[in-house]
Amino acid sequence: MKKTISLIMSVLLLLSVLTGCGTAASTATTETTESSAPDEMQGMDNSAQSAETTVVTAESGDKDSIEDALNLANIMPEWSYSESADAWTMGIVTAVTNAELPDYQGVSVCVPGAYVKGVDTDGDGTADVTSGTASGILVIDYDATVTSTKGQIYTAATAPVIINTGAAGYSAQSNQSAGTTYAAEGYINVACGNRGKQSTLSDGSYTGDAPSCLVDQKNAVRFVKYNILLGNLPGSVDYFVSTGGSGGGAHATMLAATSNNPDFYDYEIAAGAVGVYANTDGSYSTTVTIDGEEVELSDGLWGCMAYSAITSLAEADMTLDFEYYLDSTYSFNTDFQKQLAEYLAAEYMDYINAKGLTVEEAKVGFDLDGDGALTSTVALTIEYDPVGHADTNGYYGSYLDLYLAEFEQSLQDYIDRLAYAEDWTWFDADGNALSDSEVAAMTDADRAEAFLNGWYAKGSTGNSSSAGGMMAGPGGDNAGGPPSGDFSGNPPNGAGPSGDNAGGPPDMGGGTTEEVGTPDAGTTQSANSGTDSANYSSFDELLAAYEADIAEIEAGDGYGNNIVELYNPINYIGAEGTEGPTWARILMGASEGDISMLNSLNLQIAWLNAGTDANIEWQWNGGHVPSEIFGDSLALYVDTMYGKYVDGAVEIIKAAAAGQTANGTATEATGTNLTGWVDYDAEGQLTMTLSGAAAYRTSGASKATPGFDVMDYGQEDYVFGSSTADARHWDKIVLKVFREHADTLSTLFNQ
């Protein structure tokens, strides 16, 4: 347990930081915003919030002092030039004026060299240093252009800004230097630290609870945008893109989904962020002073590229167990977990049906009502018939039709891109390696037949996933870069019809090597655990712990907010006060074991209905945090979206596959035979069954039931801690099931 951190101490600390910074009232006209919380959060006591947010006000001198302190022209940071990358990297600077943990609340920026004339070291506006390392401010060349590797054209005023979100497993991310990864693309690359689960102050006080990770990333966005507006950094404030993998993918998603929503302003204000200030009447000011004029500053984003986004946690226990239970052949390790999954699956059906979801066929590209056209808006529901749909434990419906269509399309897309494979080894039906000329002559149909029958051994262009676990980001050069990995993600032994374990999914059993629930580990109970709980001796004790923890959370944090609801992006997509991104893409591995595919499906549905161009891909064979494969990349997608949505930009079309002209060097086929799961017709279209898709999904199962608010506290529990506890139970749906079915579950618990 940690000591309680007093709000009074926070106020005093903030005042001490700002003392002497000036008290002259700002006369600027500023925009005011009233907070609009999600429905689940309305009616909470906001008295603590009102008291806290009067600390930093636009009417006092605090606005001016914060803006002065966070102006890079006053900081004069260190810049280092990389000749090989032709890029300038800024040393780490603190992004706020009231940092609790400065080593975790900093920012570094990497800038393409073409946009920079040099470093002004004495403030006269001219470039004094053009290479090496120097402290000062950049002299920006706004006439220079960079043509990306995909053919898009950018300038210092129009370049996208990539914000890399860390937060591995929702953990703290220490400050790090921005990588040169995107310099050749013409992008500005931003690395930022963040507080997170298990973060503590020097006195031992716990400070890692939500929404600290997300708030620090929002503050980094504000800092960089502010300095772009000042002319201290190149880049466009209109084209910020978040990216990250796993826990980082969750935060990339949440950063975009909650763009500039006022529910987070109080937390940003408390940290001393730029461009968000409280007014004495309870409203907010969200402008900064640029050349004597007030300019709106937002923490909103233009786009999002998330890999294995582990969000929304509020839905995650239901979605994972629904997917488990959808596979009527899945073997749970205990009767308690099986029964709990059955109950949570029923809760998920009720949850989806109560939302009244719809989707436009034209937006998803699927004929869901079977009328031969893509003109309908279809209601998405889950239905139940235990006799007619026994192979999926009774579940079916239009919502699951969409789920299956996404699954089929993801496999179809994978097969359609096999022409981009460069170093695979292809075999005939008898196991003989094809000659180079035979490989060069392969048609799309030939490759599809070989793939579905498992007549191949992958090369590096088909390896798609990391080794699993809750990563911070998708890999690459320092902070920021495309994902990389070396696992194929095929179904494990016995999962597919052939029982072929050809490079199966990564080992994602997070709870197999560390003790669950220890403060330093924070791991998740694995799917192969035969014990329901090692910490609770009885179901009654377990239930009491859930009731006490969730009551604390629902009572609200220091600002009166339910932190679980704050961290639910579904609450904010399309909500009043949210600036929705123009586009979003979520790439999941189809054999992902750390979260259900239904979570990304729900995000896509919500974003599409809110007007965001939202795409999801469940990469076949991909495990946790899949790599981009077959010619795809973050840069290709960003450039394509830029060409689609920015007037005058280049329309980007993916380069055609060169085709493989020489066979690989493997000596035997290691592919998985999918013909027992997938039908492939003469027109090159494939179909699957819902039960087959569910069986494929459970083949990569890595978590017990429940998978997120785990009974012995897991890695995702720590982000919902408090000032006195670094982990708490938080899933009110799990608690509902425990209460309603206590008689049945108590007899099965730990049996």
Predicted regions and their residues:
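Disordered, low-complexity segments in secreted/periplasmic proteins that are enriched in proline
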Residues: 27-50, 447, 451, 461-530
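Catalytic-loop region of hydrolases
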Residues: 46-153
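Accessory cap/linker subdomain of secreted extracellular hydrolases
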Residues: 55-104, 261-476, 515-575, 696-745
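Short beta-strand element of the alpha/beta-hydrolase
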Residues: 135-141, 151-167, 241, 584-585
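Cap/lid segment of the alpha/beta-hydrolase catalytic domain
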Residues: 163-215, 256-258, 622-624
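Alpha/beta-hydrolase active-site loop
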Residues: 207-232, 263, 636
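Histidine-bearing beta->alpha loop at or near hydrolase active sites
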Residues: 589-592, 613-639, 660, 674, ...
